[in-house]
């Protein structure tokens, strides 16, 4: 069977002989008692689920969270993915006080990070992680010294949100523009991957596109057709072609179009759906 492995956070905590609590229910009395006994000044939360008030309100100064966007924009579960899907040129990280609502507490500090043309969700995640730890330290120092003032979020319905990724919102919509398709692919790479139904040799299946480039060129091909040109795979669009550089077929590994074509053939009627 598969062996359970501890997270890197747990492994580091164990190396420093720090107490580790892993309750099934965050409201259970034993867990609350353990936290209370710590007499903590503040809790720091990163990449965790919503905490109940009985937990985040325990410390003297409350609890702070690190969020991977410039709040109030992109509140929600998948901010890194959605800034790329929406074609943003910049994003950032925010520390804020936790309150009753998701990602809505008073802002403490923010750090802006530029988004490069070649960034995908994986590379942007790494950029933000690199900036995150120093921002948390600066936030804690500011709270400790009393020099850091928080400010309430100005939340309106017009702010972009970052809902949880699902099969529905990660599917490629082929009526979109080429840049919208490329942005979605970047925003969902390496995980979970932008996907589409396709038909080849009369059989339908699902594929994922992990990397693509846009080619703006007039053509007379039917839309959504899969074309093979040499060792490249193109999908036709009203603006030109989507050059699919890395693809993953069902039950296969992610691979380059050249590698894929070494053992897989698309017929003349192949298309995305």
Annotate the PLM regions:
Residues 1-190, 195, 240-243, 249, ...:
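One-carbon transfer enzymes
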Residues 97, 198-200, 213:
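A general secondary-structure junction signal
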Residues 179, 200, 205-207, 265:
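Intrinsically disordered, low-complexity regulatory segments enriched
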Residues 197-204, 237-239:
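Short acidic, glycine-rich loop/turn motifs
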Residues 202-217, 243-246:
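A short acidic-to-branched-hydrophobic micro-motif
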Residues 213-242, 251:
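Low-complexity, glycine/alanine/valine/leucine- and proline-rich hydrophobic stretches
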């Amino acid at each position: 069977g598969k062996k359970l492995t501890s997270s890197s956070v747990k492994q580091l905590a164990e190396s420093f002989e720090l107490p580790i609590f892993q309750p099934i229910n965050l409201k259970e009395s034993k867990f609350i008692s353990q936290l209370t006994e710590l007499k903590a000044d503040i809790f720091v939360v990163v990449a965790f689920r919503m905490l109940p008030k009985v937990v985040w309100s325990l410390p003297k100064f409350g609890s702070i969270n690190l969020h991977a966007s410039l709040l109030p924009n992109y509140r929600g579960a998948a901010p890194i993915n959605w800034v790329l899907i929406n074609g943003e040129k910049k994003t950032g990280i925010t520390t804020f006080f936790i309150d009753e609502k998701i990602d809505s507490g008073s802002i403490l500090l923010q750090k802006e990070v530029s988004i490069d043309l070649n960034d995908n969700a994986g590379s942007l995640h790494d950029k933000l992680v690199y900036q995150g730890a120093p921002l948390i330290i600066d936030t804690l120092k500011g709270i400790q010294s009393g020099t850091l003032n928080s400010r309430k979020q100005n939340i309106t319905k017009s702010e972009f949100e970052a809902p949880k990724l699902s099969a529905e919102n990660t599917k490629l919509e082929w009526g979109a523009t080429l840049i919208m398709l490329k942005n979605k692919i970047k925003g969902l790479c390496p995980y979970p991957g932008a996907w589409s139904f396709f038909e080849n040799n009369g059989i339908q299946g699902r594929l994922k596109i992990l990397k693509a480039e846009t080619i703006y060129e007039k053509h007379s091909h039917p839309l959504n057709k899969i074309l093979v040109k040499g060792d490249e795979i193109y999908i036709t669009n009203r603006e030109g072609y989507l050059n699919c550089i890395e693809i993953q077929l069902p039950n296969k590994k992610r691979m380059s179009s050249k590698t894929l074509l070494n053992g897989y053939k698309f017929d003349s009627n192949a298309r995305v759906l």
